[in-house]
Amino acid sequence: MPLFDEGEFLSPYGLRALSAYHRDHPYVLDVEGQESTIDYEPAESTTAMFGGNSNWRGPIWFPLNYLIVTTLEHYYQFFGDELTIEYPTGSGRKLNFDQITSDLRDRLISIFLVGPDGRRPCYGWVDKLQHDPAWQDNLLFNEYYHGDNAAGLGASHQTGWTGVIADLIRRRWGTVPSLGDVMADIGLMPARGTAAPSTPAPSTPAPAAQEDK
């Protein structure tokens, strides 16, 4: 399945908007002698078309990923553990849709986490953002992320669509009491591949009984 092929759509940080296959094999459409070409562009667009945005031509774009993840969640609600597919493609490993969505969420969350090299992928190679105490823990929500290394690209204030990372964290690590606490605690999140915490989510106290009047 191309969607879960690490040589096509599946990157270490989520799903690409366009298959990396087209890096070396551009798609060419001929319409009455006029050729139009699209290739894999993991970072900023190579043309000024659409203002130079390349959201849907290769980068990791959160609206697309969020729709796919939530759709796979619904598939699991219907199929349960009975249906498994190979993930990643070519790995020989069969997973159900719940396991696949968990891994996809982990990949997306890892964009913002400090990795083994001491860097947050989302800050790319901008030293000030990576190491300056005034910046390093104040995360930005970029418009989209490099399809291969997850460096943040485009506008850095997309608190609408990229902000859905908060809900993905809540869905993956259900112990977070509220979305308001999510981003403050993101630096403490376990690295991808570790087990979810076992501490139960705080329960909501029952309302106090009212006296009869």
Label the model's feature ranges.
Residues M1-K213:
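Acidic, mature catalytic/reactive cores of soluble proteins
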